[in-house]
Every structure is written in C-alpha cells, then in structure tokens.
Amino acid sequence: MAKNKDVRVTVILECTSCAQNDVHGNKVATGISRYITQKNRHNTPNRLEFQKFCPRCYKHTLHGEIKN
C-alpha cells in the first residue's frame, strides 16, 4: 500500500531581524540565529512564525520559517 507524504515535516526557523548590511545596504547574511522544529502539515499549512530568543540580538525576536 502506497504511503502519502509524511504529515510531520522538519522546518527551520530563522531570525528575521539580525541581518547584516554592507556599505550599499544590501543584505549580506540574514538570520544567523536558527531553530529546528517540526510542524504538522495538515494543521498548519502556512509558514510558521514564533517569538524566540536570538543570542545574536540578545533579545526575543520574530523567527520565521525558511525554505529547505
């Protein structure tokens, strides 16, 4: 019997506020702080966003789901 896609998928949450800018204002590196978690694809089809602690910013910031 064929099995459908897994319901639980592994996602990466990345800090949205700790982006380094170069001289011209272009983003060099975004989201140094990353968390790995799982989500249920059926219950949360949209991208996850959590307030998590960023050790680089040294405060709680918004962490959003990124593509794998």
Curated annotation (Swiss-Prot):
Q: Which UniProt keywords apply?
A: Plastid, Ribonucleoprotein, Ribosomal protein
**Compartments (UniProt record):** Plastid
Pfam families noted in UniProt:
Ribosomal_L33 (PF00471)
Keyword Translocase in record: no
| NCBIfam families attached to this UniProt entry | PRK00504.1, PRK00595.1, rpmG_bact
Family named by the database record:
Belongs to the bacterial ribosomal protein bL33 family.
| Name of the featured protein | Large ribosomal subunit protein bL33c
| Organism name | Cuscuta exaltata (Tall dodder)
Q: Which gene encodes it?
A: rpl33
